[in-house]
Amino acid sequence: MERVFTTELQKWQTSPDRKPLVLMGARQVGKTFLLKKFATDNYENSIYLNFDKDRRLGPLLFGESLDPKVLIDKLIIHFKQNIKAGSTLIIFDEVQESPDALNSLKYFHEEANEYHVCAAGSLLGVKLLNTQGFPVGQVNIEYLYPLDFFEFLVAIQETQLLAEIKNITVISPIVEFFHAKLIDLFKIYLITGGMPEAINTYLKTRNLYQVREKQAEILNAYYLDFAKHAPKEQVMKIMQVWESIPSQLVKENKKFIYSVIRQGARANDFEMAIQWLVEADLICKTYNISVPNLPLTAYVNPEIFKLYMFDVGLYGAIAGLDPEIIIHGDELFKEFKGSLTETYVAQVLHKLNAGKIRAGLYYWTSNGRAEVDFVIQHNNKVYPLEVKSGTSSKQRSLAVYADKYNSQLVLRTSPQNLKVTGNLMNIPLYMLGNIRMLLS
């Protein structure tokens, strides 16, 4: 599968300011595959170490010395391969299992930066970011997310359709034939989500029920991660928070309420569990603001927030949503339809925020009178973004927001075509990844 992030790796490879790269992201988003393919396509050879698969590697290679010259000699002997600066990519995978290997990146940067070293790991935010062993300032940190809808189109060989929505030069409706086709494919993406194994299953079988089975396998692997890596006293709480998310989002008021998990539960019972899931890159936390001024972080109410899963396909799987209902619709599906679409939007916006300092997701409320699903910042301006899962054009909350703050432009994302009506821009859900370009 082609990943847009390959471009970032190519920039890293040729950058004069290159540091060792740490690639973070949830488990099974494709970090290992991406780095191995990048090595094959762009280097003469590669050295690959998996510290989870072979627990001896950490003590054996890094136990005595973190001197890069010593480490290079050890790697040459151990793997029986030559290592040439700039021509060999060294990959430390599951690096969270070897703090010494992670710490060695500092010395590669300071003493041997001519060597190209990438480290990848899951749960790095949980295990290592707050420890002394993390080489802050000595590495380039990047994030890999599930495949977005544009990457999905490439995977299913719909590149011509992708060109129709990537190469627009004016804000005008997409040709209706293309729009209808894109909506149909978008519904499939709502089921598959962006996990590579789920999409690969769809490519091989075109069977959405087998996709759900693959997603169940991924979810089961996450439960094993909870038990293996989380503090023992937090494991059950993490599972309870994780499993409560569909119930939280199906409410009319989607804010996270602790008593949904357990009657009488309070914030201090589950704060650590929520933070663990955030740092594991498994959920997106969306904060409430009552005033949409810059910087948005200054107007956050930290006690009021929503939680979205990081992948819309896994959300549908854990909620038990039947693929047939998503494709064809059903009266009983109405309530979940909104939460599924909002989860997709959160996934897109979360990825667009990648690498931004203290970037968060935000939504706006006004004393119970109105609520706008998301508030985004672009070029020092703030825009409200309403999410519609159906074709209804009602936007009372956007109207309240526009009147209150005299907004020149408000945004809606929905299954409707691209258009601007008055001060409202409607962005088709399938085109949301282009939102910054459209605003510019």
Q: What are the roles of these predicted feature ranges?
A:
Residues 55-85:
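Short glycine-rich substrate-engagement loop in P-loop NTPases that contacts/grips substrate
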Residues 91, 116-122, 143:
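Structural recognition of the conserved hydrophobic beta-strand(s) that form the central parallel beta-sheet
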